[in-house]
Every structure is written in C-alpha cells, then in structure tokens.
Amino acid sequence: MNKKDILELKRRFKKEACTFTRLCGCYVDADRNKITTFGETFLNLEEEEFYKYLEIAKKVLSGTLGNNILNLEFPLEEEGSGGKQQFLMGLRASALKNEELMEAFFDLVIDNYSYAGNYLILVYHDAYDVMTKTSDNNKLDESEEVYEYLLCAICPVALSKPGLGYREDENRIGPRIRDWVVGVPDTGFVFPAFSDRSTDIHSCMFYTKDAKAPHNEFVESGLGCNSKFTATEQKLTFQNIVKDVIGEDDAESEALFLDIHDNLNNLIPFTEDETAEPEPIPVTPSTISSVLSESGVPDDKAQVIEKTYENIFGEEVPIAEHLVDPKLLEVNAKRKEKLELVHQVENLKQQLEETRSVPVEDGEDDVPATKTYDVILRVKPEKVEQIHSQIINGQKCLVIPMDENEHAAVNGINTTV
C-alpha cells in the first residue's frame, strides 16, 4: 500500500461516504479476561458513537508510511490450511457475523498481544466498491472491483484523571467520578492490503502508534508475518552502531558522527515540490562504506561499522531518508556556522593586527601607543615643533613640513616626499 491507496480508504471514513457494514468489539482487562463482547450494524450506531468509532478507524490509517504504517507479507505456510492468513480470509468472508470465529479472533489477539492494562479490540468490516479511474484520475461511473476488508484497532482503556467536578445529585463541588476511557489505537491492521487500488490477499497493512516499540510479538504470532524495522528503529539502530564504534564522549567523535549524517542526507535527491515523494535511495553496505570514507572515519572503524550494519539489517536495507535525523542535521548546521564565525573572527583579528602594525624607529619605544585616536603620528623629536594645524579648502588639516628627500611611512607603506 502506498500513500495514495491509504488516503483513498481514509477519505471514505465520513458520514456520507462510509460503507462499514458491521463493528464487533471485545473489552479485555489487565488479567486478559474478556469483560464484554458486542457486535453492531455500523449504520445503526447512535450518531455520537458513529463518529467516535470513525475517528478510531481513521487513526489506524494515520502516520508515516514505513514508520507508523508497515506493509507486511504472509509467509507461504500461513496461506495454507490452519494458517493465520486463511483464518483472516474466513473471518472476512463471514462479514463478522459468525460468533465462533469472532471469539476465536479475540482469543488470538489476547494470547499474542502483550499489554499491561485494559484494552479494547475493535474489528470493522467494509466492502468498498472501487470505481474505475481514467489516466487523469477522473472517476468513471462503473465498478472495477469490490474491495472487501477488515480493519482492526487495539485501543488502551485507562481511568480518567482524578479531579474536582460538579456533583449534580448533591449540588456541590466534589471529587469527580473516574471512569474507564477508550484511547486512540496503539496497534492495528488492515487485511487484505489495498495495493494499487486492488485487493492483495498475500499482504496486510500494520499500524503502530509507537514507532520506537511496535508490538512485534503480535505481528509474528498474531498475524503470522515476519516483523519489520520501523524507520525510527532503523535510525536509532544505525546511530547506536556508529556510536559504539567511534565513541561519543569527545568533540571529535561528535563532529564525525554529525558529518556522517550530513553525508547520508546528501544522498537524498532535492526536490522543490514538497508534495512529491522523494525517490527512495537504498543504503547498502557499499553505500555505507562510501559515506564513512567521505566523512573521514578511519578504515579499521569503518570496516567494523559496515560488518555490523550488514549483520543487523541483512536484506532489509534501509533507505537514506529513514537513517537521517533532521534534528542532528540542524545541530551540525549550527556547529558549522559557529566554526565559520570563529574562523572569520580570527581572520579579522589578523587583518587588524597587520593594519595597525607601523614600524617604530630606534629610540621611539617610549612613545605612548593608544587605539583611541583616529590618527597616530610617530616623528623625530626635532620635527614636533614644526607640526601645526591649518584650514585648507575649508578642511581642517594637520601640516607636517617635509625637507627634501625626507621619508615617511603611512600605515607601514614607505613614501618619499
């Protein structure tokens, strides 16, 4: 599923376009006990409930593709008899009306979802009549196929915050009654996937709210798919690989680490169109080798980083965009700006020193030097009495009479008068 596929589904989650046929749910406590289960025709829900459940469904299709949203493929063994994919196919075919299948699904989630607290399992059934589109994306009034799918959302349920409130039955302000509130989804999935505006029964879309710690136990045991790194996991893992080798306790290591990020960012093609998706650039071990070399990482350390990188990521090669941390790019830009300012200040100091350095003849070391005057004269004692001021062409001037063949130096430049 790409961004267009996800947005096409998500845009339909509103009152006038929604086609959800049924909603089923199971409320589970912290001890994994089923507190209650329910099943409803979606369009029969009360208006407030209708919109709340729609908001939950939208959240499962929210976030960044490759980070919060992952495309997962089913292994061949899961597509055979008794496999997870076959079970989900049967659940979809039942349109959530088979109670035994629903109970089996809830048990599957409870047994394979690790969460310390109460939560609500929600499953939606939908049948989307996919309209044919022309090459310029205009819809034609004819059906291309019916995309029938399940959307599952697993939402944490927590007590509302304590506080004071108006107790109407007692007509006073007192402790507010705390109740259990359903939160936004922590985990979810869509089966089958909607790829290139068509049903893909060999794949599903997985959603995680926390990209740093997705529920891989549910991916592997609940859905029967191989877990994948999120973009956040790839970025943090790569940073740890580099820091473990080059260190992070001194300024030199930090500068090297930041330069590696800059060079990775240079791999990403620049585009002025902010809506356009950047072309994914795979960062293979050989690419890492080039980046490390360009950044000035010593060969022995570079080899360790490359080997560890290849062992951890294997065939699941990250793209450059997933490894780059915008915050670190900003830090490095400020660091380079500061270094450039320091360099400019040093150059200015050197230029000032050269400008102010005027040769002093022997015996004149006792002449007081000061930087508060615009003009500083150093002359032989016998010429002091000859110096006088005079108005010339309306301009006040300092006149120093010069004898034939006398020499003068102005700002260190020798002049013969």
Report residues per predicted region.
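General "foldedness" signal
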Residues: 23, 27, 119, 410-414
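Extended, charge-rich low-complexity regions and/or helical-solenoid scaffolds
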Residues: 367-368, 378-417
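Leu/Val/Ala/Ile-rich N-terminal alpha-helices, chiefly Sec-type signal peptides and the beginnings
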Residues: 10-31
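Phospho-regulated, Ser/Thr/Pro-rich intrinsically disordered or coiled-coil terminal scaffolds
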Residues: 1-4
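C-terminal helix-loop subdomains that flank or include functional centers
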Residues: 373-377
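Active-site-proximal "nucleotidyltransferase
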Residues: 7
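Long, hydrophobic alpha/beta structural blocks
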Residues: 29-365
